[in-house]
Amino acid sequence: MILFPAIDLKNGQCVRLEQGDMARATVFNLDPAAQARSFAAQGFQYLHVVDLDGAFAGKPVNAQAVESMLKVVSMPVQLGGGIRDLKTVEGWLAKGISRVIIGTAAVRDPALVKQAAKKFPGRVAVGLDARDGKVAVEGWAESSQVTALEIAQRFEDAGVAAIIFTDIARDGLLKGINWEATIALAEAVSIPVIASGGLASIDDVKALLSPRANKLEGAIAGRALYDGRLDPAEALALIDAARAA
């Protein structure tokens, strides 16, 4: 079970959004590399990064900030936002990103996901961000007419490393993860699922470690870490204890 600390990038800064709204961004750190270093020092073992500007632009925008983080941490980093073609996938993996997350293109161009996953086994994940049950695209600015489960099932035998499932309605609001929808997705597909959106407290970490969540690979923590509602040491100690049991 992995707890991924999140760094969302906007204008080269580390921010958190509310419900994916770029107009409701709170800056938490002007220096993403310093934030990444801090997460590493706290004991986290895998970093989750999103290029928010890239998600809207359809191409990498905060490359300089991402590269600055790669220089200061040795832990693996997964990256999403603006990854819409094979060249971008190849470019990020060559620069040291451990796993790329394909979101909009997974809906618009499923062949890209399959091609990338085949070429780079274990290094391609799919990001499914749902609003009212339907997957949103283009940096959450548009809603599609397909469900997360429908998209996930397209990639069952494609070699996708993980699915990051985000409930947009809860993202950045500290309302708790949508366990019902997340676990239902995890039980319906063989691809490992990572919970995202709304992680609020140590109670969510405990839920992550409960038997009903045993098909999940982990969860992403954002605002709860930044505003002190989740103590990294307590959360990681719980996970370590569960791993040792």
From Swiss-Prot:
Signal peptide: none
UniProt EC number: 5.3.1.16
Any one Pfam family match given in the protein's UniProt record, by short name: His_biosynth
One Gene Ontology molecular-function label: 1-(5-phosphoribosyl)-5-[(5-phosphoribosylamino)methylideneamino]imidazole-4-carboxamide isomerase activity
Catalytic activity: 1-(5-phospho-beta-D-ribosyl)-5-[(5-phospho-beta-D-ribosylamino)methylideneamino]imidazole-4-carboxamide = 5-[(5-phospho-1-deoxy-D-ribulos-1-ylimino)methylamino]-1-(5-phospho-beta-D-ribosyl)imidazole-4-carboxamide
UniProt-annotated location(s): Cytoplasm
Pathway linked to the protein: Amino-acid biosynthesis; L-histidine biosynthesis; L-histidine from 5-phospho-alpha-D-ribose 1-diphosphate: step 4/9
Alphabetized InterPro entries for the sequence: Aldolase_TIM, His_biosynth, HisA_bact_arch, Isoase_HisA-like, Isoase_HisA-like_bact, RibuloseP-bd_barrel
GO terms, biological process: L-histidine biosynthetic process; L-tryptophan biosynthetic process
Enzyme class: isomerase
Matches recorded under HAMAP family: HisA (MF_01014)
Listed NCBIfam families: 1-(5-phosphoribosyl)-5-[(5-phosphoribosylamino)methylideneamino]imidazole-4-carboxamide isomerase, PRK13585.1
Similarity section: Belongs to the HisA/HisF family.
Protein name, per record: 1-(5-phosphoribosyl)-5-[(5-phosphoribosylamino)methylideneamino] imidazole-4-carboxamide isomerase
Species this chain originates from: Rhodopseudomonas palustris (strain BisB5)
Gene responsible for this protein: hisA
